[in-house]
């Protein structure tokens, strides 16, 4: 089987790959549009002259400016960290659908608070609004990947969870370009910097409206004992009847997994909490999930997202307009590469190989950019234009983006959404999202100080971390593409890690063939299907 083949766990009717699952994933992913926009717009908005003038930037020392910038950016991540954990009880008792609604409402309240800020009132409303917005997106970053992964057929689960990442990049693209637009078309004023803050309300409003029409996760309904509603929702999503052999297999697998969990860990609210800290198998996967986000943030991506003007200034770009334009192009590159990742790479190349290639290529690019800054010291360039070396540095920066985006940007979210048992999934995703926001907070809080003290060493620091992630992934992270959620336990128990995927998939195919043979011998004929994808054929 080629690494470029899409892997099905069993013959799948064409009706399963329908527009409904893509629509549900797209609606839920307005959450990530909120996250992406907030991550992108804030760094360039606070660099606008109109913002600096209104909040008396010139009266602050350089150290104070760095501190205030870091606080404005990082209080959002602090809120998101706690929001990710608050999402666990909400997701357990209220479900994924209404959890997403609540996260959008809290975010909207935070965005509204920020709009009340001005020079007379000071930055307090921005700080408070950023914390509330962070609470909302932190909870949303828990609910959305789980919701999508629980709806998705295994063969396209990576693609569907990848819609969450695409939403992040689309929001980021708007966030990067909006400040270039207001800087070019509006005179410095209160409105100029307020408009980027107001645009936050658009994806939040779309999510609130969309959530009213989506279906609750069938797997959550099964977990809560609402069986009839769960089967009804699953049939609607799959577009096949409950007595179809595919549905019989899927419902049977869910029932079997829940029964196993009921007899071991338990299905309540408190038992998973206890199990998470005492069960070595679960602790190990929590460690893997948290470390994936450590390596992701250690690549330097959020230093660039939040402080892109500082990053491009270190390479030698002069002028706010040039910095905003270059940042906008950075957003375009990320979005285009994310679309390729979503449509093809994540479910064909798989998670593991993408992480390895991205870490190796991205590390090389960071070493080159850091070495250029060390040798040339472009910040002392008296010319208004980049020289040849500066252009080359910008090229390697964008090449780093092309390596990083289809690997470490969204793949850790995909893996974390699929590698846990159903009764522990909400708690595990809370821990995963919380760890992302913790590392995110640390990077965003100290990036200005790192650039002030380390200069080119910042790039060497990020390059080293990307290099260290390679043995971690190779020896510890198995491939998960095409593996049903109910089969993650044997996948993570199979050794060696680099052969686990092939071994487990072979066992799944063997079990599925035996199940269908037994059904045929019993006289069951309804719902025979042909496999949609030939998994031994190159796409």
From Swiss-Prot:
Topology within the bilayer: Multi-pass membrane protein
PTMs per UniProt: Ubiquitinated. Deubiquitinated by creB, probably to control its activity or amount.
Keywords, in A-Z order: Cell membrane, Membrane, Quinate metabolism, Transmembrane, Transmembrane helix, Transport, Ubl conjugation
CDD domains: MFS_HXT
GO MF entries: carbohydrate:proton symporter activity
Main location: membrane
InterPro entries: MFS_dom, MFS_sugar_transport-like, MFS_Sugar_Transporters, MFS_trans_sf, Sugar/inositol_transpt, Sugar_transporter_CS
Residue numbers on the Cytoplasmic membrane side: 1-22, 96-97, 152-159, 215-285, 347-352, 409-456
Compartments, record wording: Cell membrane
Spans through the membrane: 23-43, 75-95, 98-118, 131-151, 160-180, 194-214, 286-306, 326-346, 353-373, 388-408, 457-477
GO biological process: quinate metabolic process
Pfam families assigned to the protein according to its UniProt record, in alphabetical order: Sugar_tr
GO CC annotations on file: plasma membrane
Residue spans, topological domain Extracellular: 44-74, 119-130, 181-193, 307-325, 374-387, 478-539
Family: Belongs to the major facilitator superfamily. Sugar transporter (TC 2.A.1.1) family.
Subunit structure: Interacts with creB.
PANTHER family: MAJOR FACILITATOR SUPERFAMILY (MFS) PROFILE DOMAIN-CONTAINING PROTEIN-RELATED (PTHR48022:SF34), PLASTIDIC GLUCOSE TRANSPORTER 4 (PTHR48022)
Protein role: Integral membrane transporter that imports quinic acid to be catabolized as a carbon source.
The protein's name in its UniProt record: Probable quinate permease
Protein's gene: qutD
